[in-house]
Amino acid sequence: SVACASGMAALTMALMNILRSGDHVVAAAGLYGGTVELLDELKAYGITTTYVRENTPQAFEAEITPQTKVVFAETIGNPKLDVTDIQGVAEIAHKHGIPFLVDNTVATPYLVNPLKLGADIVIHSSSKYINGSSDAISGILISGGSFKWNAEKFPGMAEFKKFGPFAYLAKLRNGLFRSMGACLAPQNAFLNTLGLETL
C-alpha cells in the first residue's frame, strides 16, 4: 500500500504507473467528476478513455482494444450510486490480460474488499469515509500483487518483475511516487488514524 496526498493523487499514481502515450483506458459510466477531468487531462499525453454505457461485464468487454491497458470502475458510482459487478468485470479484464483498477471510496474496505473479488489495484479517497471527520485530505493505493505483468504488453514493468507480487508497488515507489510529490503529510496521516474509529 501507498498513502497519498489525496484521492486524486492516489488515482493519478495508480494510472500513470501503468500508462504511457498510445494507451487506452476502459472506464465505467458515471464516474466521480474529478476522475472524468483527470482522464480528460490525460488526452494531452496521448492516453485515451472510452466510457461504457452501463457497468456490466459485457459492456466493458465490448470497449477493450489491443491498446487497452487498464479497466477502471468505482465499486459504488459517485454520484449515480450504480454498483459494479467487480467479480464479473475482473474476469473480463483478466481474460484480456489487463489489470482491473477499482475506486472503493464510497464502499470503504468495511463494506467491500475489491481485491477479494478479483480487482488488482484499489484506491480510496480516504478524506471521505475512512477519515470520517473532514479534517484531512488523503488517498490510499493498494496493489493485490496477483496480477501477472506481461513485459511485452507493459514494457515499463519489465525491470520490476523481479519483485514478484510487489512489482507494481516497487515501480511506483521508485518512480512517480518519489518524484511527483504525492506522499501523504504526517499530520494528515495522524488525523486519519483518529478518524478511523468513526468508520
Where would I find each of the regions flagged by the language model?
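Conserved PLP-enzyme active-site core in the AAT-like
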Residues: 2-199
